[in-house]
Amino acid sequence: EAVAPYERPALSKNIFYLREIADADQLVEAIKLKDGRTLDADIVVVGVGGRPLVSLFKTSIPDVYAVGDVATYPLKLYNELRRVEHVDHARLSIEEYDYLPYFYSRTFNLAWQFYGDNVGETVLFPDNFGTYWIKVVGVFLEGGTPDEYKVARVQPPVESLDQLAK
């Protein structure tokens, strides 16, 4: 649901988003859609994300450091090391700071920003388009069980909004 407003302008220009590849070999001649239609194609652009092969960077030479998109950084908000691929982070990471992951993109006449992490149940707000990911960050218990107490400590993603009503 969240991608529909971004797919519509592309579809109007005969650009299709495919989420699965089957029976792939080395030569592209056509693309078969789930609805059975076949589209002739000479080239397919695949976006799969990026993760550097950092094992190639290992060295025993002193004072050699990784910088830029291949380097991890301690994100206090999530208590873990992560790669942060954003110019804002590159400008600020010379010193310790509390960074909120952020990126943005522009497609056709649409522009959007993403803040934080996409863990938990997706909740769409259609009036002013946006998506929020719901995660437990605290609990109020009246005579709670040990398992309910653990929820506050673990802070799991919410698998279903129905869970919040229980």
UniProtKB/Swiss-Prot annotation:
Disulfide bonds: none annotated. It comes from the Eukaryota. Pfam families: MDHAR3-like_C (PF21791). Keywords: FAD, Flavoprotein, NAD, Oxidoreductase, Redox-active center. GO terms for molecular function: monodehydroascorbate reductase (NADH) activity. Its cofactor is FAD. Gene3D superfamilies: 3.30.390.30, FAD/NAD(P)-binding domain. Its EC number is 1.6.5.4. The keyword Flavoprotein applies. The N-terminus is blocked. Optimum pH is 7-9. It catalyses: 2 monodehydro-L-ascorbate radical + NADH + H(+) = 2 L-ascorbate + NAD(+). It is an enzyme of class 1 (oxidoreductase). Belongs to the FAD-dependent oxidoreductase family. Catalyzes the conversion of monodehydroascorbate to ascorbate, oxidizing NADH in the process. PANTHER family: APOPTOSIS-INDUCING FACTOR 1 (PTHR43557), MONODEHYDROASCORBATE REDUCTASE 1, PEROXISOMAL (PTHR43557:SF5). This is Monodehydroascorbate reductase, fruit isozyme.
